[in-house]
């Protein structure tokens, strides 16, 4: 249900402005000795830094979880903005999925999440300013705890990404 809720929030609480939410959790530990099973993929969690807008970034996990990330997701979190010059819904439907693009200066951040507990492919069109650019999308890996990297050489702006159950993806377009 966590992924379904996450895919509903951009269309309800977050539709007209900032909201209070503390996403982007990679570990299964809430605190020392207390575990909670994360129901989404790590790429879904990474995407929430873009999909949700709260006025300032506040990630909810322990420092160890972020320090143990592979370099590309770690760099993504270092660069993701808290203030946006432009935001747009690229594709989605409440509780099903959401793909959001947000611009800070000349840099676009893309985040997409699935609210369904099944494998799927999501298709969307990039903002006009992003068409023709090459970049790497951080996607679901072999299981919910792994990332993969999808180089994109875009020509027409149409993107298709395969997702794991409760999956997601994120990317930076310069």
Predicted regions and their residues:
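Conserved, mostly hydrophobic/aromatic
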Residues: 51, 110, 166
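Edge strands and adjacent loops of beta-rich recognition modules
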Residues: 73-102
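C-terminal beta-strand-rich structural cap/linker in extracellular carbohydrate-active enzymes
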Residues: 151-174
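A glycine-rich phosphate-binding loop feature that marks nucleotide/adenosyl-phosphate handling sites
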Residues: 64-73
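Solvent-exposed beta-strand/loop surfaces of large extracellular or lumenal domains
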Residues: 137-156
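Glycan-recognition surfaces
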Residues: 1-64, 92
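A common structural junction motif
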Residues: 128-133, 141
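Carbohydrate-binding surface patches
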Residues: 93-130, 169-170
């Amino acid at each position: 249900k966590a992924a379904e809720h996450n895919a509903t929030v951009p269309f309800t609480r977050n539709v007209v402005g900032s909201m209070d939410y503390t996403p982007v959790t990679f570990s299964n530990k809430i605190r020392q000795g207390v575990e909670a099973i994360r129901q989404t993929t790590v790429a879904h969690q990474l995407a929430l830094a873009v999909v949700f807008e709260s006025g300032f970034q506040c990630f909810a996990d322990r420092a160890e979880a972020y320090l143990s990330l592979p370099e590309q997701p770690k760099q993504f979190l270092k660069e993701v903005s808290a203030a946006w010059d432009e935001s747009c819904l690229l594709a989605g439907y409440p509780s099903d999925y959401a793909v959001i693009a947000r611009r800070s200066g000349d840099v676009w951040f893309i985040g997409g999440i699935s609210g369904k507990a099944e494998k799927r492919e999501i298709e969307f069109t990039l903002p006009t300013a992003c068409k023709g650019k090459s970049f790497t999308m951080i996607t679901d890996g072999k299981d919910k705890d792994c990332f993969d990297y999808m180089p994109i050489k875009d020509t027409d702006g149409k993107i298709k990404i395969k997702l794991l159950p409760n999956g997601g993806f994120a990317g930076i377009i310069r």
